[in-house]
C-alpha cells in the first residue's frame, strides 16, 4: 500500500513476506507462525482487511463475519480466522493499490475508555477458536497478542485527559488483570 504521511510525502509499504501464490502448505509454513502476532509484537501479515480481497463463497463457506462483541480492531480477529481457513492466497508485493492516510483519531492512536475490555474479549474469542485447532499451536501468539494490546492500552492512557492518579489506576488495572497474568 501507499503510506501517505501528514506532510504529504508517501512511500510504498509492503509486508515482510514474498510476493506470489501461497498454497495451504506455504500458509502453514510461512503464515501460521505469525498469523495472529509475530515474535516482534507486530500484527501478522494478513491482519488488516483493507489490504485483502475475499471471495464471497469463501466467507459464506466458513461463516466469516465481524465479531459484534469486538468494537475496535475487529479486523484482527476476522483476518486471523480467514487466514487460518484459507487454502491459498496471492500477495501482490509492490502494488500500491490502497492509500493509507495518518488518522490521529483511530483506535490504534487514540485513547478509548473500555478498550482493554474489548481487547480482552477479542483475545478470549481467539482462544475459543485457536485452542481447539490441532494443525498448529497458536498459544504463544495468543499470549503475545494480549501483551501487545496491554502495551497499546497503557501507552494510550497518557492521552486520556485523566489525572495522573487516574492514569496510574487504569494502568495498574491492566497490569494486574488476570488476562495479562495468563499471557
Give the positions of each predicted feature.
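Amphipathic alpha-helical repeat scaffolds of TPR domains
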Residues: 143-155
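Residue-level preference for long, well-ordered alpha-helices that form the structural scaffold
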Residues: 115-119, 163
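Short, charged, amphipathic alpha-helical segments
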Residues: 117, 139-145, 167-172
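Active-site catalytic microenvironments for nucleophilic, acid-base chemistry
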Residues: 84-85, 129, 156
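Membrane-interface aromatic/basic loop that binds lipid-linked glycans or pyrophosphate carriers
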Residues: 128, 158-183
Amino acid at each position: 500500500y501507499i503510506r501517505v504521511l501528514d506532510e504529504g510525502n508517501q512511500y510504498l509499504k509492503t509486508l515482510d513476506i514474498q510476493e506470489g501464490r501461497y498454497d495451504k502448505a506455504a500458509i502453514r509454513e510461512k503464515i501460521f507462525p505469525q498469523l495472529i502476532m509475530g515474535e516482534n509484537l507486530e500484527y501478522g501479515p494478513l491482519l488488516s482487511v483493507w489490504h485483502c480481497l475475499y471471495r464471497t463463497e469463501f466467507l459464506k463457506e466458513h461463516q466469516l463475519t465481524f465479531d459484534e462483541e469486538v468494537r475496535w480492531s475487529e479486523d484482527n480477529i476476522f483476518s486471523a480466522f480467514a487466514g487460518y481457513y484459507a487454502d491459498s492466497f496471492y500477495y501482490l508485493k509492490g502494488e500500491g493499490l490502497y492509500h493509507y492516510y495518518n488518522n490521529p483519531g483511530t483506535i490504534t492512536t487514540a485513547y478509548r475508555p473500555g478498550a482493554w475490555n474489548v481487547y480482552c474479549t477479542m483475545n478470549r474469542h481467539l482462544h475459543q477458536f485457536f485452542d481447539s485447532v490441532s494443525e498448529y499451536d497458536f498459544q504463544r501468539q495468543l499470549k503475545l497478542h494480549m501483551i501487545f494490546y496491554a502495551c497499546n492500552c497503557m501507552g494510550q492512557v497518557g492521552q486520556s485527559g485523566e489525572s495522573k492518579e487516574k492514569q496510574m489506576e487504569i494502568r495498574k488495572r491492566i497490569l494486574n488483570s488476570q488476562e495479562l497474568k495468563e499471557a
